[in-house]
Each structure stands twice: as structure tokens, then as C-alpha cells.
């Protein structure tokens, strides 16, 4: 799947009538380096500056900066999006983190349920490890 996304990014990069946006933020920089136009990245709701900087570094082919910023994106992915045991862990982790940051509620529509206090504590710890000062609510 990853190779298909990258191939399409490269194949469509010069087509002015087509925009290629990737969803998985873990591959946004690589896709932009190959011609994609950007990403639809959930983590940008938490850390907009990080994702804009990563996009700009990829657009400018600043590989040192891409590597530095990509490490942070991968840390977010590995710590916030993996709490829980179900496929919904990405969404629930994101919503929980946004709630802890005071951005929005951690409400998720049925059939999902928001994280319990134990999982919220793990998200809080992940945010602390990312250097974010948050109050556990």
C-alpha cells in the first residue's frame, strides 16, 4: 500500500488538476518529497507548528530537518495512537490528547467509548514525554 501511495504521488506531481494528499502522517514527508501536495494529518490538530514545519522541510528538501521533525511525528504515533487494544486507538488517543490540551472534548461517537482514567493517564504521560505541560483532568 505504501509503495502504491508513493508511486501515485510521483506520477501525479506535475498534474495541475490533481492534488495528492496523504492521510497517514507517518508518510506525509516522504510523499511530499516525491510530489504529493500535503497531508490530512490528525496530529496537526495537536501540534500544528510541527506538521507545518515538517511539510515545509519536505517541500524544500531539507533532509536534516525532515529527519529531526519526523522523529517527533513517529514518537506521537508510537505513544499517543497506540494506547488501547482496538483499531479505534488512533482516534481515541487523538481525541483524548486534544481534550487534555483543552482543545476539545474527548467524546467519540458510538460505537466507540472515550478512554477511561487509566488510558488517559498514559496519554498524559505521552504528552509529558513530548515536552507538553498539561494538567491531568
Regions found by a protein language model. Give the residues of each.
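Short, small-residue-biased leader/transition segments that mark boundaries at the very start
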Residues: 1-6
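Hydrophobic alpha-helical
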Residues: 7, 22, 30
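Short beta-strand/loop segments at the ligand-binding rim of alpha/beta enzyme cores
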Residues: 11-21
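Structured C-terminal cap/extension of enzyme domains
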Residues: 14, 26-137
Amino acid at each position: 500500500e505504501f509503495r502504491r501511495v508513493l508511486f501515485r504521488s510521483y506520477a501525479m506531481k506535475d498534474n495541475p488538476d490533481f492534488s495528492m494528499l496523504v492521510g497517514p502522517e507517518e508518510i506525509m514527508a516522504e510523499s511530499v518529497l516525491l510530489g504529493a501536495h500535503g497531508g490530512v494529518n490528525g496530529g496537526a490538530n495537536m501540534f500544528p507548528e510541527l506538521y507545518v514545519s515538517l511539510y515545509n522541510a519536505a517541500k524544500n528538501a531539507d533532509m536534516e530537518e525532515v529527519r529531526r521533525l519526523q522523529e517527533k511525528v513517529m514518537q506521537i504515533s508510537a505513544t499517543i495512537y497506540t494506547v488501547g487494544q482496538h483499531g479505534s486507538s488512533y482516534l481515541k488517543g487523538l481525541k483524548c490528547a486534544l481534550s487534555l490540551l483543552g482543545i476539545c472534548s474527548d467524546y467519540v461517537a458510538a460505537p466507540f467509548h472515550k478512554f477511561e482514567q487509566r488510558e488517559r493517564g498514559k496519554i498524559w504521560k505521552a504528552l509529558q514525554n513530548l515536552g507538553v505541560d498539561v494538567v491531568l483532568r
